[in-house]
C-alpha cells in the first residue's frame, strides 16, 4: 500500500512539474512573437495625397497578410512630418489605424528644426512615437528584416 501511495505521489508530482514547465514554455513563446512579415513605410513628402496613399498601403498590406501576421510602421520625417501633426488632414485616420496595430513614428530632428525655424514645437497626434532620427529608424528596421516601401 505504501509503495502504491508513493508511486501515486511521485506521478502526481511529475505531472505538476511538467504542467508548470509547459506553461512556462508556452508563455515564453508568446512573449517573443515575431510576425511573418514586417514593413516600414517612409513618408517624406508634405503632399496630402502621399499621406493618404501611405495609409492605404498600410491598410491594404495588413488586410492581405492579416493583422496578426504583419508588423507595419510608418516613419515620417522632413516635410512628411506634417502627416503626424494634429493639423494634418489625416489625423482621424492615423488615430484609428493605431488601434489596428499600425505604428507611427516621427523624426525628432525634423521637429527640432521646425521648432528652431518657427519658434513652436510641432504637436503630434496622440500616440505617435518619436525617435531622434527618422532615417536612422528606417535603416534600423531594415536591419531587423523590415521591407521598405515609399509611396
Region spans (language model):
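Short, low-complexity disordered leader/linker segments with a strong preference
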Residues: 6, 20-23
Amino acid at each position: 500500500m505504501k509503495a502504491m501511495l508513493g508511486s501515486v505521489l511521485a506521478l502526481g508530482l511529475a505531472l505538476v512539474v511538467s504542467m508548470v514547465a509547459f506553461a512556462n514554455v508556452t508563455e515564453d513563446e508568446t512573449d517573443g512573437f515575431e510576425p511573418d512579415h514586417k514593413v516600414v513605410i517612409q513618408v517624406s513628402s508634405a503632399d496630402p495625397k502621399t499621406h493618404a496613399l501611405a495609409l492605404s498601403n498600410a491598410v491594404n498590406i495588413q488586410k492581405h497578410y492579416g493583422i496578426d501576421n504583419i508588423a507595419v510602421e510608418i516613419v515620417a520625417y522632413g516635410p512628411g512630418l506634417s502627416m503626424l501633426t494634429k493639423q494634418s488632414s489625416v489625423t482621424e485616420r492615423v488615430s484609428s489605424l493605431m488601434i489596428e496595430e499600425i505604428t507611427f513614428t516621427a523624426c525628432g530632428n525634423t521637429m527640432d528644426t521646425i521648432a528652431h525655424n518657427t519658434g513652436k514645437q510641432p504637436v503630434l497626434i496622440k500616440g505617435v512615437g518619436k525617435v531622434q532620427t527618422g532615417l536612422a529608424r528606417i535603416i534600423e528596421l531594415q536591419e531587423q528584416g523590415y521591407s521598405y516601401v515609399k509611396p
